[in-house]
Amino acid sequence: MYQELLTIKGDSYCLAKEDITCISDNWALPTSYLEFVQELGFGRLLELFLTYIPMGKDNNYCDSLERRNAYWKDVFQQYIQVPLSMLKKKENLELLMNAEPFMFSENGEVVFWDVRYPKAGEYPIYLVHFPVGIYFVGYHFREFITRLTCEETYKSILKFHESPLLPTFEPLSVNQMTSLS
């Protein structure tokens, strides 16, 4: 499914296990993201975003979805304490307070789900670029990819990019560590 949408650069995949479908007791991972990480796994998406895979509770992988989600939730809490102008809007503050981060860009943007509004096994996807703003990207992971690679839609999300992102995926190896240092 996703291999038809993306050009794959490499062939050594680190895939998510099919039996791990959540990283929290409160919400399940969206179907479209599970399909992606079970098909393509951990790597660099669109030459910019690092995709993380669920590896199970108490795993020793710093690049697991569980560990990265916890790390970015802590970072978000620190930003909430800072008087950023982008957080003066009540909607943005509430989005950040309820965010479930799942991807990070090499430019510093963080992609997250708003799990308060599930629909058909999916959650709205947002991209936050501190201190610039929070941008709605789509309702499922395939839409996330297509909106950022489309000439007509990428600029409404990636304000400082001059062209749409390339539809690529580069598989990467997951590092086993006990900290995020």
Regions of interest found by a model, annotated:
Residues 105, 118, 129-130:
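Acidic surface patches and DE-rich sequence motifs
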Residues 146-181:
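Acidic, proline/glycine-rich low-complexity IDRs
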Residues 124-156:
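Compact, glycine/acidic-enriched structural inserts
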Residues 48, 54-55, 62, 130, ...:
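Short, charged/polar low-complexity linear motifs in solvent-exposed/disordered segments
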Residues 109-117:
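Short, surface-exposed beta-strand/loop micro-motifs that present aromatic residues
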Residues 120-122:
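A short alpha->loop->secondary-structure connector
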Residues 1-109, 176-181:
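A surface-exposed partner-binding patch
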Residues 101, 111-112, 124-126:
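Generic structural signal for residues positioned in beta-strands
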